[in-house]
Amino acid sequence: AMRMKDEEWDTVIATNLTAVARLSRAVLRGMMKAKYGRIINITSVVGAAGNPGQMNYAAAKAGVAGMSRALAREIGSRNITVNCVAPGFIDTDMTKALTEQQVAALLQQIPAGRLGAPEDVAASVAFLASSQAGYITGTTLHVNGGMYMSGG
């Protein structure tokens, strides 16, 4: 945090929070006219739990969750749901760059004992986009094998 430059902060906030707000606003007019819509934002386990050295990313992803809850309250009466999916560590090119020791340390924090698959995240998004999820709004679905468990 102490070594993070302002431009590093600004770039991550612009990419991971400001862009999401702009995209949400851009789709609202059509959804309001249709009196139907699903907005599903991608946050992260880091936004809920934090991660050393990622103050900017954690703030941006936590901001997306807060923004989504506020928007859900604002437009919920129009049959538009707003939710988040918060992946944990998923088996992608990004996690393939981790060392064996880093993966082993992560797996000790994940009760499921494995990294997630991209399909785990995709299925969660597909569910929230479906008609079966019409009464779910303003929530974050954590897809992380139990690495982070929210209270309540």
Residue ranges and their predicted role:
Residues 44:
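Residue(s) in the substrate-gating loop at a strand-loop-helix junction
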Residues 49-52, 126, 137-152:
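Short C-terminal tail/terminal secondary-structure segment
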Residues 2, 49-55, 77-78, 113, ...:
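Active-site loop immediately N-terminal to the catalytic Tyr-X3-Lys motif
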Residues 24, 60, 68:
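Active-site helix of classical SDR
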Residues 1, 5-13, 95, 106:
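Substrate-binding pocket helix/loop in short-chain dehydrogenase/reductase
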Residues 110-121, 132:
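A conserved structural motif in NAD(P)-dependent oxidoreductases
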Residues 29, 73-77, 134:
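Alpha-helical segment proximal to the catalytic Tyr-Lys
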